[in-house]
């Protein structure tokens, strides 16, 4: 009995450890490293999120940014994530937060995803990924706000920068 309990606990602890901090297959520069809640909220504040917004989180991990956007600001949220285990975790988190009717999580490639509905796009992605995403982000509707946790987009200076504890968050507005 004790062996079964230890084995079960070991497996339960191993799954999140396997997801967290490991590169996804075929994507050596994409890691799941969750944004702290305080930083996620500061990102949404910097973007000026309201109930009229549709917040897309690229590489949404456990879904915390769309969930906070829905819970605290009344916005609709969309998480785009390639890892099906994290999508399942996101739906569980949304149900726990009682905002599953205001958010969606889809398995998708952020380079192929349709972002046309977004009024706010958030990301915590490496500089190389941000650089590759830049043309897609620049093509969004004028006025769309893009907020990055920590990473810049080379050649596109942010409109605002804000320090939150040890992290920097950056805001761009798609020009007209």
What are these regions (language model features)?
Residues 6-16:
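Bacterial N-terminal signal peptides
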Residues 63-67:
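Glycine-rich SAM-binding Motif I of class I
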Residues 128-176:
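C-terminal substrate-binding/active-site "lid" region of AdoMet-derived donor-dependent transferases
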């Amino acid at each position: 009995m004790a062996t079964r309990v230890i084995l079960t606990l070991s497996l339960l602890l191993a799954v999140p450890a396997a997801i967290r901090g490991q590169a996804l297959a075929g994507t050596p520069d994409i890691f799941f490293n969750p944004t702290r809640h305080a930083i996620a909220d500061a990102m949404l504040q910097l973007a000026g999120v309201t109930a009229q917004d549709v917040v897309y989180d690229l590489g949404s991990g456990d879904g915390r940014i769309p969930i906070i956007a829905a819970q605290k600001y009344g916005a609709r949220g969309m998480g785009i994530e390639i890892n099906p285990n994290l999508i399942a975790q996101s739906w569980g988190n949304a149900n726990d937060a009682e905002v599953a009717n205001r958010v969606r999580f889809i398995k998708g490639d952020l380079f192929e995803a349709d972002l046309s509905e977004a009024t706010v796009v958030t990301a915590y992605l490496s500089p190389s990924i941000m650089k590759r995403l830049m043309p897609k982000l620049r093509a969004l509707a004028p006025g769309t706000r893009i907020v990055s946790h920590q990473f810049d987009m080379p050649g596109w200076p942010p409109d605002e920068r804000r320090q939150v504890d040890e992290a920097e968050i950056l805001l761009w507005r798609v020009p007209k």
